[in-house]
Amino acid sequence: MATSVELSSYRDQHFKGSRSEQERSLKDSCTLYVGNLSFYTTEEQIHELFSRCGDVRLIVMGLDKYKKTPCGFCFVEYYIRSEAESAMRFVNGTRLDDRLIRVDWDAGFIEGRQYGRGKTGGQVRDEYRTDYDAGRGGYGKLLSLKIAPNTDNR
């Protein structure tokens, strides 16, 4: 099993550049992607947790691209790589708002990446969920649209 600071197999499919450029960016990056957040987790809570590992330079909350409300992820950027490595070691897999959060390397925040990429504006993973998850908006958004009663023909 890989240690926390090694690169995972996940790669952002929207990265602008070659695979080797992406690998290099990830290995030099001070930016982390944080996933599986509750929609109700605040920037202040994230700062409190991640600042235990070093000086946080920037937090960018992930937003629903239509509603501009939190949608369960963020980016955390440190000033130096070693502090980001500490966060990978010690924060990945911990609980925040009663949820196990995932921390992974990110090649660096670029404007526009703070928005969900799903059809309904949030994260793709929340669109098809069949279980109820109160911390992430209930049932999957596309499932909710399919089972919503049709009131047009009444």
Swiss-Prot record:
GO terms for biological process: mRNA cis splicing, via spliceosome; negative regulation of viral genome replication; primary miRNA processing; regulatory ncRNA-mediated post-transcriptional gene silencing; siRNA processing. The keyword RNA-binding applies. GO terms for cellular component: nuclear cap binding complex; nucleus; presynaptic cytosol. Keywords: mRNA processing, mRNA splicing, Nucleus, RNA-binding, RNA-mediated gene silencing. InterPro entries: NCBP2, NCBP2_RRM, Nucleotide-bd_a/b_plait_sf, RBD_domain_sf, RRM_dom. MRNA binds at residues 10, 33, 102-106, 113-117, 123-124. Residues 30-108 form the RRM domain. The keyword Nucleus applies. One of its GO terms (molecular function) is RNA cap binding. It is found in: Nucleus. It holds the Pfam family RRM_1. Its main location: nucleus. CDD domains: RRM_NCBP2. Component of the cap-binding complex (CBC), which binds co-transcriptionally to the 5' cap of pre-mRNAs and is involved in various processes such as pre-mRNA splicing and RNA-mediated gene silencing (RNAi). The CBC complex is involved in miRNA-mediated RNA interference via its interaction with Ars2 and is required for primary microRNAs (miRNAs) processing. Also involved in innate immunity via the short interfering RNAs (siRNAs) processing machinery by restricting the viral RNA production. Component of the nuclear cap-binding complex (CBC), a heterodimer composed of Cbp80 and Cbp20 that interacts with m7GpppG-capped RNA. Interacts with Ars2. Belongs to the RRM NCBP2 family. This is Nuclear cap-binding protein subunit 2. It comes from Drosophila persimilis. The gene is Cbp20.
